[in-house]
Protein backbone atom coordinates (compact mmCIF):
# COMPACT_ATOMS: atom_id res chain seq x y z
CA UNK A 1 0.00 0.00 0.00
CA UNK A 2 1.30 3.45 -0.89
CA UNK A 3 1.28 5.90 1.98
CA UNK A 4 0.80 9.50 0.91
CA UNK A 5 3.12 11.80 2.91
CA UNK A 6 0.68 14.70 2.86
CA UNK A 7 -2.11 12.46 4.18
CA UNK A 8 0.10 11.42 7.08
CA UNK A 9 1.00 15.03 7.80
CA UNK A 10 -2.65 16.06 7.69
CA UNK A 11 -3.34 13.38 10.28
CA UNK A 12 -0.54 14.70 12.48
CA UNK A 13 -1.85 18.22 12.13
CA UNK A 14 -5.35 17.11 13.07
CA UNK A 15 -3.93 15.35 16.13
CA UNK A 16 -2.25 18.62 17.08
CA UNK A 17 -5.65 20.15 17.65
CA UNK A 18 -5.58 18.43 21.00
CA UNK A 19 -9.06 16.92 20.95
CA UNK A 20 -11.01 19.83 19.50
CA UNK A 21 -11.55 18.11 16.15
CA UNK A 22 -14.91 16.39 16.13
CA UNK A 23 -16.12 18.06 19.33
CA UNK A 24 -19.50 19.72 19.44
CA UNK A 25 -19.50 23.29 18.19
CA UNK A 26 -20.60 26.27 20.23
CA UNK A 27 -24.10 27.32 19.13
CA UNK A 28 -22.71 30.85 18.73
CA UNK A 29 -20.73 29.61 15.73
CA UNK A 30 -23.81 28.85 13.61
CA UNK A 31 -24.16 31.04 10.55
CA UNK A 32 -20.78 32.72 11.02
CA UNK A 33 -17.38 32.54 9.37
CA UNK A 34 -15.45 30.26 11.70
CA UNK A 35 -11.71 30.82 12.03
CA UNK A 36 -9.11 28.93 14.07
CA UNK A 37 -6.50 30.42 16.40
CA UNK A 38 -3.68 28.31 17.83
CA UNK A 39 -2.21 29.76 21.01
CA UNK A 40 0.39 28.98 23.66
CA UNK A 41 -0.53 30.97 26.75
CA UNK A 42 -0.81 28.77 29.83
CA UNK A 43 -2.23 29.20 33.33
CA UNK A 44 -3.75 32.57 34.20
CA UNK A 45 -2.75 34.06 30.85
CA UNK A 46 -4.67 31.33 29.05
CA UNK A 47 -7.76 32.18 31.09
CA UNK A 48 -7.43 35.84 30.13
CA UNK A 49 -7.09 35.07 26.42
CA UNK A 50 -10.03 32.67 26.40
CA UNK A 51 -12.13 35.28 28.18
CA UNK A 52 -11.22 37.88 25.55
CA UNK A 53 -11.96 35.50 22.67
CA UNK A 54 -15.36 34.73 24.18
CA UNK A 55 -16.06 38.45 24.49
CA UNK A 56 -15.12 39.03 20.86
CA UNK A 57 -17.37 36.17 19.75
CA UNK A 58 -20.26 37.66 21.72
CA UNK A 59 -19.64 41.19 20.42
CA UNK A 60 -20.61 40.58 16.78
CA UNK A 61 -22.43 38.11 14.55
CA UNK A 62 -20.10 37.66 11.56
CA UNK A 63 -17.03 35.84 12.90
CA UNK A 64 -16.49 33.01 15.34
CA UNK A 65 -12.95 32.40 16.65
CA UNK A 66 -12.11 28.86 17.75
CA UNK A 67 -9.08 29.17 20.05
CA UNK A 68 -7.06 26.02 20.77
CA UNK A 69 -4.18 25.61 23.21
CA UNK A 70 -1.12 23.97 21.60
CA UNK A 71 1.46 23.75 24.38
CA UNK A 72 4.36 26.11 24.97
CA UNK A 73 5.83 28.35 22.27
CA UNK A 74 8.22 25.74 20.92
CA UNK A 75 5.72 22.87 21.02
CA UNK A 76 3.14 25.01 19.23
CA UNK A 77 5.65 26.10 16.60
CA UNK A 78 6.58 22.49 15.85
CA UNK A 79 2.89 21.66 15.37
CA UNK A 80 2.40 24.73 13.20
CA UNK A 81 5.28 23.82 10.90
CA UNK A 82 3.91 20.29 10.52
CA UNK A 83 0.45 21.66 9.77
CA UNK A 84 1.81 24.11 7.18
CA UNK A 85 3.53 21.29 5.28
CA UNK A 86 0.34 19.23 5.48
CA UNK A 87 -1.82 22.07 4.22
CA UNK A 88 -3.79 21.94 7.47
CA UNK A 89 -2.57 25.02 9.32
CA UNK A 90 -4.90 27.29 11.27
CA UNK A 91 -5.73 30.66 9.76
CA UNK A 92 -3.88 32.42 12.59
CA UNK A 93 -1.42 31.66 15.33
CA UNK A 94 1.22 33.46 17.34
CA UNK A 95 4.96 32.81 17.15
CA UNK A 96 8.13 33.99 18.88
CA UNK A 97 9.80 36.99 17.30
CA UNK A 98 12.99 35.11 16.42
CA UNK A 99 11.13 32.87 13.95
CA UNK A 100 9.15 35.57 12.11
CA UNK A 101 11.94 36.31 9.56
CA UNK A 102 12.27 32.60 8.74
CA UNK A 103 8.52 32.13 8.24
CA UNK A 104 8.35 35.27 6.10
CA UNK A 105 11.26 34.20 3.91
CA UNK A 106 9.61 30.77 3.56
CA UNK A 107 6.58 32.52 2.08
CA UNK A 108 4.01 31.16 4.53
CA UNK A 109 2.92 34.42 6.20
CA UNK A 110 0.16 36.63 4.82
CA UNK A 111 1.22 40.25 4.09
CA UNK A 112 -1.10 42.48 6.11
CA UNK A 113 -0.42 45.95 4.65
CA UNK A 114 -3.46 45.84 2.37
CA UNK A 115 -6.01 44.94 5.05
CA UNK A 116 -8.40 47.68 6.28
CA UNK A 117 -6.82 49.83 9.00
CA UNK A 118 -3.41 48.16 8.85
CA UNK A 119 -1.67 51.53 8.55
CA UNK A 120 -3.55 53.04 11.50
CA UNK A 121 -3.09 50.56 14.33
CA UNK A 122 -1.19 53.02 16.56
CA UNK A 123 1.27 50.49 17.94
CA UNK A 124 4.21 51.10 20.28
CA UNK A 125 7.10 51.15 17.83
CA UNK A 126 9.59 49.20 19.96
CA UNK A 127 7.07 46.36 20.29
CA UNK A 128 5.77 46.37 16.71
CA UNK A 129 7.43 44.64 13.77
CA UNK A 130 9.14 47.80 12.54
CA UNK A 131 10.92 48.43 15.86
CA UNK A 132 11.60 44.85 16.89
CA UNK A 133 14.06 44.17 14.07
CA UNK A 134 17.16 45.98 12.84
CA UNK A 135 16.43 48.34 9.95
CA UNK A 136 16.89 46.71 6.56
CA UNK A 137 15.17 47.20 3.24
CA UNK A 138 11.41 47.66 3.77
CA UNK A 139 9.55 44.47 4.67
CA UNK A 140 5.83 43.83 4.32
CA UNK A 141 3.85 43.83 7.55
CA UNK A 142 3.46 40.15 8.44
CA UNK A 143 3.29 40.16 12.26
CA UNK A 144 1.22 42.01 14.86
CA UNK A 145 2.44 42.28 18.47
CA UNK A 146 0.30 41.32 21.41
CA UNK A 147 1.95 39.44 24.27
CA UNK A 148 5.23 41.35 24.25
CA UNK A 149 7.70 41.33 27.11
CA UNK A 150 11.21 41.95 28.37
CA UNK A 151 13.16 40.08 31.05
CA UNK A 152 13.19 41.90 34.38
CA UNK A 153 14.68 41.42 37.84
CA UNK A 154 12.28 40.32 40.58
CA UNK A 155 13.20 40.27 44.23
CA UNK A 156 11.65 39.28 47.52
CA UNK A 157 10.90 42.63 49.16
CA UNK A 158 11.05 41.23 52.69
CA UNK A 159 14.46 39.61 52.16
CA UNK A 160 15.98 42.68 50.55
CA UNK A 161 14.68 44.93 53.33
CA UNK A 162 15.94 42.57 56.04
CA UNK A 163 19.39 42.52 54.44
CA UNK A 164 19.30 46.33 54.14
CA UNK A 165 20.25 46.16 50.48
CA UNK A 166 19.47 48.44 47.60
CA UNK A 167 18.36 47.04 44.27
CA UNK A 168 21.45 46.03 42.24
CA UNK A 169 21.92 48.01 39.04
CA UNK A 170 25.30 46.66 37.88
CA UNK A 171 26.75 43.18 37.48
CA UNK A 172 29.10 43.76 40.41
CA UNK A 173 26.23 44.93 42.60
CA UNK A 174 24.22 41.88 41.52
CA UNK A 175 27.01 39.55 42.64
CA UNK A 176 27.35 41.38 45.96
CA UNK A 177 23.60 41.29 46.60
CA UNK A 178 23.42 37.59 45.71
CA UNK A 179 26.20 36.85 48.21
CA UNK A 180 24.41 38.77 50.95
CA UNK A 181 21.07 37.08 50.23
CA UNK A 182 22.30 33.48 49.94
CA UNK A 183 21.51 31.46 53.06
CA UNK A 184 23.89 28.50 53.35
CA UNK A 185 24.60 26.01 56.11
CA UNK A 186 27.55 23.88 55.05
CA UNK A 187 26.68 22.50 51.63
CA UNK A 188 22.96 23.03 52.12
CA UNK A 189 21.41 26.17 50.66
CA UNK A 190 17.97 27.17 51.91
CA UNK A 191 17.85 30.41 49.91
CA UNK A 192 19.78 31.21 46.75
CA UNK A 193 20.71 34.80 46.10
CA UNK A 194 19.78 34.56 42.42
CA UNK A 195 18.05 32.09 40.15
CA UNK A 196 17.99 32.44 36.37
CA UNK A 197 17.11 29.98 33.60
CA UNK A 198 20.20 29.15 31.55
CA UNK A 199 18.68 29.99 28.21
CA UNK A 200 19.08 32.13 25.10
CA UNK A 201 16.90 35.10 26.06
CA UNK A 202 18.71 35.87 29.31
CA UNK A 203 22.12 35.25 27.76
CA UNK A 204 21.25 37.69 24.94
CA UNK A 205 20.43 40.31 27.61
CA UNK A 206 23.86 39.82 29.20
CA UNK A 207 25.56 39.96 25.79
CA UNK A 208 23.92 43.32 25.11
CA UNK A 209 24.86 44.63 28.55
CA UNK A 210 28.49 43.68 27.86
CA UNK A 211 28.33 45.69 24.63
CA UNK A 212 27.89 42.87 22.10
CA UNK A 213 25.43 41.76 19.44
CA UNK A 214 24.30 38.24 18.64
CA UNK A 215 24.21 38.84 14.87
CA UNK A 216 25.16 41.41 12.31
CA UNK A 217 22.39 42.89 10.19
CA UNK A 218 23.43 40.58 7.35
CA UNK A 219 22.87 37.52 9.55
CA UNK A 220 26.53 36.76 10.36
CA UNK A 221 26.55 35.04 13.81
CA UNK A 222 28.73 37.22 16.03
CA UNK A 223 27.36 35.56 19.17
CA UNK A 224 28.52 38.57 21.10
CA UNK A 225 32.19 37.91 20.35
CA UNK A 226 34.04 38.75 23.61
CA UNK A 227 30.80 40.03 25.17
CA UNK A 228 29.24 36.60 24.64
CA UNK A 229 32.13 35.05 26.55
CA UNK A 230 31.79 37.58 29.38
CA UNK A 231 28.07 36.84 29.64
CA UNK A 232 28.68 33.13 30.12
CA UNK A 233 31.54 33.79 32.52
CA UNK A 234 29.26 35.87 34.76
CA UNK A 235 26.97 32.87 35.19
CA UNK A 236 29.93 30.53 35.68
CA UNK A 237 31.38 32.70 38.44
CA UNK A 238 28.08 33.09 40.27
CA UNK A 239 27.37 29.35 40.09
CA UNK A 240 30.84 27.93 40.81
CA UNK A 241 32.92 30.62 42.53
CA UNK A 242 30.36 32.65 44.46
CA UNK A 243 27.96 29.69 44.80
CA UNK A 244 25.09 32.16 44.98
CA UNK A 245 23.14 31.37 41.81
CA UNK A 246 21.06 28.29 41.15
CA UNK A 247 20.65 27.24 37.52
CA UNK A 248 17.16 25.67 37.62
CA UNK A 249 16.75 22.12 36.31
CA UNK A 250 14.73 21.44 33.18
CA UNK A 251 14.78 22.66 29.60
CA UNK A 252 13.02 25.59 28.00
CA UNK A 253 9.94 26.73 29.91
CA UNK A 254 10.18 23.92 32.46
CA UNK A 255 13.20 25.74 33.89
CA UNK A 256 11.24 28.99 33.94
CA UNK A 257 8.47 27.29 35.95
CA UNK A 258 11.00 25.96 38.47
CA UNK A 259 12.43 29.48 38.82
CA UNK A 260 9.00 30.92 39.57
CA UNK A 261 8.19 28.20 42.10
CA UNK A 262 11.51 28.60 43.90
CA UNK A 263 10.91 32.34 44.16
CA UNK A 264 7.39 31.90 45.55
CA UNK A 265 8.64 29.29 48.04
CA UNK A 266 11.42 31.57 49.31
CA UNK A 267 14.17 29.38 47.89
CA UNK A 268 15.40 32.25 45.68
CA UNK A 269 15.69 35.87 46.82
CA UNK A 270 16.05 37.30 43.31
CA UNK A 271 15.16 35.88 39.90
CA UNK A 272 15.46 36.82 36.28
CA UNK A 273 12.28 36.06 34.38
CA UNK A 274 9.74 37.64 32.07
CA UNK A 275 7.39 40.48 32.84
CA UNK A 276 4.77 38.01 31.57
CA UNK A 277 4.76 36.37 35.01
CA UNK A 278 4.27 39.60 36.94
CA UNK A 279 0.61 39.18 37.83
CA UNK A 280 1.05 35.48 38.57
CA UNK A 281 3.91 36.14 40.98
CA UNK A 282 2.14 39.05 42.68
CA UNK A 283 -1.06 37.05 43.10
CA UNK A 284 0.64 33.98 44.56
CA UNK A 285 3.46 35.39 46.70
CA UNK A 286 3.21 35.63 50.50
CA UNK A 287 5.72 38.51 50.49
CA UNK A 288 6.02 41.83 48.65
CA UNK A 289 7.10 41.20 45.05
CA UNK A 290 9.29 43.94 43.67
CA UNK A 291 10.56 44.40 40.13
CA UNK A 292 13.42 46.40 38.64
CA UNK A 293 15.29 46.75 35.35
CA UNK A 294 18.03 44.22 34.67
CA UNK A 295 21.42 45.36 35.99
CA UNK A 296 23.80 46.74 33.40
CA UNK A 297 27.49 46.27 32.73
CA UNK A 298 29.00 48.48 30.03
CA UNK A 299 25.50 49.61 29.13
CA UNK A 300 21.87 48.87 29.82
CA UNK A 301 20.33 46.43 27.33
CA UNK A 302 17.43 43.99 27.09
CA UNK A 303 15.93 41.94 24.28
CA UNK A 304 12.21 42.05 23.68
CA UNK A 305 10.32 38.78 23.84
CA UNK A 306 6.91 37.25 23.63
CA UNK A 307 5.10 36.59 20.39
CA UNK A 308 3.43 38.08 17.35
CA UNK A 309 0.10 37.18 15.79
CA UNK A 310 0.48 35.94 12.21
CA UNK A 311 -1.94 34.92 9.45
CA UNK A 312 -1.21 31.94 7.23
CA UNK A 313 -0.91 32.84 3.57
CA UNK A 314 -2.49 29.56 2.49
CA UNK A 315 -5.70 30.01 4.50
CA UNK A 316 -8.98 30.51 2.59
CA UNK A 317 -9.74 34.16 1.82
CA UNK A 318 -12.86 34.21 3.99
CA UNK A 319 -10.93 32.92 6.98
CA UNK A 320 -8.16 35.46 6.46
CA UNK A 321 -10.65 38.33 6.39
CA UNK A 322 -12.32 36.98 9.53
CA UNK A 323 -8.96 36.52 11.26
CA UNK A 324 -7.98 40.09 10.40
CA UNK A 325 -11.18 41.41 11.97
CA UNK A 326 -10.33 39.60 15.20
CA UNK A 327 -6.68 40.68 15.22
CA UNK A 328 -7.57 44.30 14.56
CA UNK A 329 -10.02 44.12 17.48
CA UNK A 330 -7.24 42.70 19.68
CA UNK A 331 -4.98 45.66 18.79
CA UNK A 332 -7.51 48.22 20.06
CA UNK A 333 -6.60 50.06 23.29
CA UNK A 334 -9.39 48.48 25.35
CA UNK A 335 -8.14 44.99 24.59
CA UNK A 336 -4.45 45.78 25.05
CA UNK A 337 -5.24 47.43 28.39
CA UNK A 338 -7.20 44.39 29.55
CA UNK A 339 -4.42 42.05 28.49
CA UNK A 340 -1.61 44.10 30.05
CA UNK A 341 -3.31 44.79 33.38
CA UNK A 342 -4.44 41.17 33.73
CA UNK A 343 -1.09 39.57 32.94
CA UNK A 344 2.02 41.77 33.13
CA UNK A 345 2.73 41.87 29.41
CA UNK A 346 3.25 45.33 27.95
CA UNK A 347 0.41 47.21 26.24
CA UNK A 348 1.17 47.38 22.52
CA UNK A 349 -1.09 50.32 21.61
CA UNK A 350 0.29 53.82 22.25
CA UNK A 351 -3.16 55.08 23.26
CA UNK A 352 -3.37 52.28 25.82
CA UNK A 353 -0.10 53.40 27.41
CA UNK A 354 -1.34 57.00 27.54
CA UNK A 355 -4.62 55.98 29.15
CA UNK A 356 -2.88 53.83 31.76
CA UNK A 357 -0.61 56.74 32.65
CA UNK A 358 -3.51 59.20 32.85
CA UNK A 359 -5.56 56.81 35.00
CA UNK A 360 -2.67 56.44 37.48
CA UNK A 361 -2.23 52.73 36.83
CA UNK A 362 1.57 52.85 36.86
CA UNK A 363 1.63 54.85 40.10
CA UNK A 364 -0.52 52.21 41.77
CA UNK A 365 1.33 49.33 40.10
CA UNK A 366 4.98 50.43 39.69
CA UNK A 367 6.10 46.89 38.87
CA UNK A 368 4.16 47.17 35.60
CA UNK A 369 6.15 50.24 34.64
CA UNK A 370 9.53 48.48 34.75
CA UNK A 371 9.35 46.70 31.40
CA UNK A 372 7.93 49.79 29.69
CA UNK A 373 10.82 51.90 31.00
CA UNK A 374 13.30 49.29 29.80
CA UNK A 375 12.13 49.72 26.21
CA UNK A 376 14.50 52.67 25.84
CA UNK A 377 17.30 50.07 26.14
CA UNK A 378 15.67 47.44 23.91
CA UNK A 379 17.98 45.66 21.46
CA UNK A 380 16.45 45.00 18.04
CA UNK A 381 16.66 41.49 16.64
CA UNK A 382 18.32 41.00 13.26
CA UNK A 383 15.93 40.27 10.39
CA UNK A 384 17.68 37.00 9.56
CA UNK A 385 16.04 33.76 8.47
CA UNK A 386 18.75 31.84 10.36
CA UNK A 387 18.11 33.56 13.72
CA UNK A 388 15.77 30.95 15.17
CA UNK A 389 17.97 28.04 14.05
CA UNK A 390 21.06 29.67 15.57
CA UNK A 391 19.14 30.08 18.81
CA UNK A 392 17.70 26.57 19.06
CA UNK A 393 20.38 24.43 17.40
CA UNK A 394 23.67 26.26 17.89
CA UNK A 395 23.55 28.32 21.08
CA UNK A 396 20.89 27.02 23.47
CA UNK A 397 22.29 23.45 23.73
CA UNK A 398 25.72 24.83 24.66
CA UNK A 399 24.72 27.35 27.33
CA UNK A 400 23.82 24.76 29.94
CA UNK A 401 26.96 22.76 29.13
CA UNK A 402 29.10 25.85 29.66
CA UNK A 403 27.49 26.74 32.99
CA UNK A 404 26.85 23.34 34.58
CA UNK A 405 30.04 21.61 33.38
CA UNK A 406 32.08 24.81 33.38
CA UNK A 407 33.32 24.25 29.87
CA UNK A 408 35.45 27.01 28.40
CA UNK A 409 33.01 29.72 27.32
CA UNK A 410 35.16 30.98 24.46
CA UNK A 411 35.62 27.48 23.07
CA UNK A 412 31.92 26.63 23.22
CA UNK A 413 30.84 29.83 21.51
CA UNK A 414 33.46 29.24 18.81
CA UNK A 415 31.89 25.81 18.26
CA UNK A 416 28.43 27.38 18.08
CA UNK A 417 29.61 29.98 15.57
CA UNK A 418 31.29 27.30 13.44
CA UNK A 419 28.09 25.24 13.37
CA UNK A 420 26.00 28.29 12.50
CA UNK A 421 28.28 29.15 9.57
CA UNK A 422 28.43 25.57 8.30
CA UNK A 423 24.64 25.27 8.32
CA UNK A 424 24.11 28.57 6.50
Where are these regions (language model features)?
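Extracytoplasmic/periplasmic solute-binding protein
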Residues: 134-146, 151, 175-222, 227, ...
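Extracytoplasmic/periplasmic substrate-recognition and gating elements
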Residues: 58-59, 66, 139, 162-163, ...
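Glycine-centered hinge/linker elements that transmit conformational signals in sensory
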Residues: 178-180, 220-252
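Long, aromatic- and glycine/proline-rich binding clefts that accommodate carbohydrate-like moieties
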Residues: 124-134, 289-292, 341-393, 401
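Hinge/lid segment of periplasmic solute-binding proteins
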Residues: 97-152, 175, 290, 360-365, ...
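Extracytoplasmic "Venus flytrap"/periplasmic binding protein-like
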Residues: 55, 59-126, 158-169, 261-262, ...
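N-terminal export signals
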Residues: 7-25
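Conserved C-terminal helix/tail region of periplasmic/extracytoplasmic solute-binding proteins
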Residues: 161, 373-424
